[in-house]
Amino acid sequence: MVKEIYKKYSIVKDLFSRADDVLGFRLSNIILNGPTAKINLTENTQPAIFVVSYSLFTLIKKEFNINLNQAKFFAGHSLGEFSALACANSLSFDDTVLLLNQRGKSMQVAVPAGQGGMLVVLGKDIDYID
């Protein structure tokens, strides 16, 4: 889905390009074309999710003329906190991209590729899960 938005809106292309410049590699190519193995490396996943979410926020704000400057607060969970901070202008786009790349590298070192995982269980009580 982001590929179509990327193609259609120059503001999104510009932010993807800016992230590429900040990082010194083509994160945009990884986001748009993969391969999956590269996007699944958390050093890429972290800034990629941010770049996409921040691009969509900026698109809504500027292209569709929605005034989000009146927002009383921005919130996010985990990685989303960084998007919220950048959208609230508490962190710059460039600093957030670099920070999340480093955060991803640190997380990757803590859990080597192919080890560990994540699971979500919805709608079951604890006795069923045990």
Per-segment meaning from a language model:
Residues D21-F25, C87-D130:
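Alpha/beta catalytic cores of group-transfer enzymes, especially the acyltransferase/condensing modules
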Residues T36-A37, F73-L79, G104, G116-V120:
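Short, glycine/charge-rich beta-strand/loop segments that flank catalytic centers
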Residues D14, A48, S78-L79, L91, ...:
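An amphipathic alpha-helix/helix-turn recognition signal
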Residues L56, E81-F82, S106, I126:
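A short acidic, glycine/proline-enriched capping/turn motif at secondary-structure boundaries
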Residues M1-A75, K124:
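Helix-rich "cap/lid" substructures immediately adjacent to catalytic or cofactor-binding pockets
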Residues S53, K72-G76, G80, A84, ...:
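Gly/Ala-rich beta-loop-alpha elbow adjacent to hydrolase catalytic centers
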